[in-house]
From Swiss-Prot:
Domain of life: Eukaryota
The species this protein was found in: Homo sapiens (Human)
Modification after translation (UniProt): Phosphorylation at Ser-13 by CK2 and at Tyr-18 by SRC inhibits activation of mitophagy. Following hypoxia, dephosphorylated at Tyr-18, leading to interaction with MAP1 LC3 family proteins and triggering mitophagy. Dephosphorylation is mediated by PGAM5. Phosphorylated by ULK1 at Ser-17 which enhances FUNDC1 binding to LC3. Ubiquitinated on Lys-119. Deubiquitinated by USP19; leading to hypoxia-induced DRP1 oligomerization and GTPase activity.
Record localization: Mitochondrion outer membrane
Subunit structure: Interacts (via YXXL motif) with MAP1 LC3 family proteins MAP1LC3A, MAP1LC3B and GABARAP. Interacts with DNM1L/DPR1. Interacts with GPX4.
Protein topology in the membrane: Multi-pass membrane protein
Organismal lineage: Eukaryota, Metazoa, Chordata, Craniata, Vertebrata
Ranges spanned by the short sequence motif YXXL, renumbered to the chain: 18-21
Tissue distribution: Widely expressed.
Described function: Integral mitochondrial outer-membrane protein that mediates the formation of mitochondria-associated endoplasmic reticulum membranes (MAMs). In turn, mediates angiogenesis and neoangiogenesis through interference with intracellular Ca(2+) communication and regulation of the vascular endothelial growth factor receptor KDR/VEGFR2 expression at both mRNA and protein levels. Also acts as an activator of hypoxia-induced mitophagy, an important mechanism for mitochondrial quality and homeostasis, by interacting with and recruiting LC3 protein family to mitochondria.
One protein family per Pfam: FUN14
Protein known as: FUN14 domain-containing protein 1
């Protein structure tokens, strides 16, 4: 038994309208934590007392500062040791540095960085605005984090 297919419908019509969405404005209006955690998350720390917020920020800041200090010491030791070995090798005659070539390469790198910095400025400004807004909305826990971070660096 043969079935009869209906004629194809014309889906394009004059009354179809589409809304144009500007993604840059959308991104500015919607905070990054809403995109990651959903709209119901919000700043959860506002539910806690000021003392609890300061303690939470202080403890997380201290942990971050302590880890930053340990990793920073290791990185500084590695970089400093590398420079020391390079200096010894240069003084002993194993390595000769072509300073004109180094200067040329550094100037080339500076030009490339300036070009890239001019292109990335809007994205960086948007990120800075979001971070500033986050800090303003959560000033208590942010100040606790900064204090804890500095204590973690000192310990």
């Amino acid at each position: 038994m043969a079935t009869r297919n209906p004629p194809p419908q014309d889906y394009e019509s004059d009354d179809d309208s589409y809304e144009v969405l500007d993604l840059t404005e959308y991104a500015r209006r919607h905070q990054w934590w809403n995109r990651v955690f959903g709209h119901s998350s919000g700043p959860m720390v506002e539910k806690y007392s000021v003392a609890t917020q300061i303690v939470m920020g202080g403890v997380t800041g201290w942990c971050a500062g302590f880890l930053f200090q340990k990793v920073g010491k290791l990185a500084a030791t590695a970089v400093g040791g590398g420079f020391l070995l390079l200096q010894i090798a240069s003084h002993s005659g194993y390595v000769q540095i072509d300073w004109k070539r180094v200067e040329k390469d550094v100037n080339k790198a500076k030009r490339q960085i300036k070009k890239r910095a001019n292109k990335a400025a809007p994205e960086i400004n948007n990120l800075i605005e979001e971070a500033t807004e986050f800090i303003k909305q959560n000033i208590v826990i942010s100040s606790g984090f900064v204090g804890g971070f500095l204590l973690g660096l000192a310990s």
